[in-house]
């Protein structure tokens, strides 16, 4: 969601992006790619550089140490430990800072992160296939395939970018899905999503493809207190994670 570019003399001398939580931030990656060319250059970044110690050191310190002369920020970081503090730290170090360039695009790009920080909940994407008359299945319950090959390819790419996918027990029983990310080009997915089934009565069959692949692909079954103890124990034994 966060990318950075170092530019000098009208040319890009370094690029970087934040791959995942806990890894080096976009600014640090871009500065490392630029090396000595970063001195006196301009840093463009989609989100305000952090100024606190977390999983990684403050990006503001790396920017100052690299000798960057100017920083252009698309959007402020809503995280309470930053939220304008990064801009203030850079300006205090004598670096020219501009904020708000392509802000609308940056806000859209960082919407999942902002939702987590501001609304205290995950970013949720609703996906379904529906016919022109508003139906999701035929009268007999058949639904394969309302969607097209093109839309299914998009879904698999999307699965490769999210942390989890959630379905109800009805879908799990009717479709016996895998719910894994399987890009049509065979490319490796950037992350392994957790498959979640909402199953209040612990009805997910041990022979289902979800359970049978639980050792290779993470599976979490959320069951209710009314679920029979024997079924809960069976699921827990099969997948190791049957949460009540």
Language model features by range: what are they?
Residues 6-105, 194, 220, 225:
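Zn2+-dependent cytidine deaminase-like catalytic core
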Residues 2-10, 128-129:
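Short beta-strand scaffold segments in enzyme catalytic cores
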Residues 22-23, 87, 101-131, 135:
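Proteins enriched for Cys/Gly/acidic motifs involved in redox and nucleic-acid/cofactor modification
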Residues 115, 123-128, 132, 136-241:
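Active-site ligand-binding patch in enzyme domains
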């Amino acid at each position: 969601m966060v990318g950075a570019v170092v530019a000098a003399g009208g040319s890009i001398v370094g690029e970087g992006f934040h791959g995942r939580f806990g890894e080096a931030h976009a600014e640090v990656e871009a500065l490392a790619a630029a090396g000595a060319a970063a001195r006196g250059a301009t840093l463009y970044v989609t989100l305000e550089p952090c100024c606190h110690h977390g999983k990684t050191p403050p990006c503001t310190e790396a920017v100052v140490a690299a000798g960057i002369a100017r920083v252009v920020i698309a959007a402020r970081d809503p995280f309470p430990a930053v939220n304008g503090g990064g801009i203030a730290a850079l300006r205090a170090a004598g670096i020219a800072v501009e904020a708000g360039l392509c802000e609308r695009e940056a806000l859209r790009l960082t919407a999942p992160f902002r939702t987590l920080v501001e609304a205290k909940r995950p970013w949720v994407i609703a996906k379904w296939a529906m016919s022109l008359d508003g139906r999701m299945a035929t009268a007999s319950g058949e639904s394969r395939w309302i969607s097209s090959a093109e839309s299914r390819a998009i879904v698999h790419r999307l699965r490769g970018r999210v942390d989890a996918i959630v379905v109800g027990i009805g879908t799990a029983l009717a479709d016996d899905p895998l719910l894994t990310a399987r890009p049509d080009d065979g490319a490796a997915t950037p992350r392994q999503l957790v498959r979640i089934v909402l199953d209040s009565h612990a009805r997910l069959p041990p022979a289902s493809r979800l359970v049978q692949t639980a050792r290779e692909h993470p599976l979490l079954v959320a069951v209710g207190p009314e679920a029979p103890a024997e079924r809960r124990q069976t699921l827990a034994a099969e997948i190791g994670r049957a949460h009540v």
